[in-house]
Amino acid sequence: MKEENLKLAAANLGEGVTFKGLMSKKAHLKNGVAKEAKDIPGWDYVVKEAAGGVCYSYYAAQPPLIGMTRPVVIKCPLGVRAFDTYKIDFKEAINIFHKLDCGDAFTEMALYYVLYPGVNEPHWYIRSVTGCTVVIGADSGKVMDPVHRE
């Protein structure tokens, strides 16, 4: 899956600007909690510019909704790497989440590629209303052991 929003955001910054890749993607949830894909009206993106390595943050609505904010320069986040593609979209990640015994709703959903030895794909991180954090491989669909927090 390629993020089409990257092209739109780069176009907002001027001619010739391209982004190296996605650094993170965090869901905005209706009323702070979600059960399904329709409960996500948009996303906060952090992307890295190809030429200078500068990072930008912006919001983009989830289609069929429209709209996005102008990208603003931010400090690049530490501990994550840029990536261009992934196979498991957020709808499929939500379906995988519902197959687990971690509650029926979630309060956070994010996608990023942790810069850590042995991590070879980006991951979806979904925090359930029961306090369980589900980690799903964004290429493999593999579920890591859920992490329970109090």
PLM regions and their residue ranges:
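Long, terminal "pre-/pro-" and other extracytoplasmic accessory regions
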Residues: 1-150
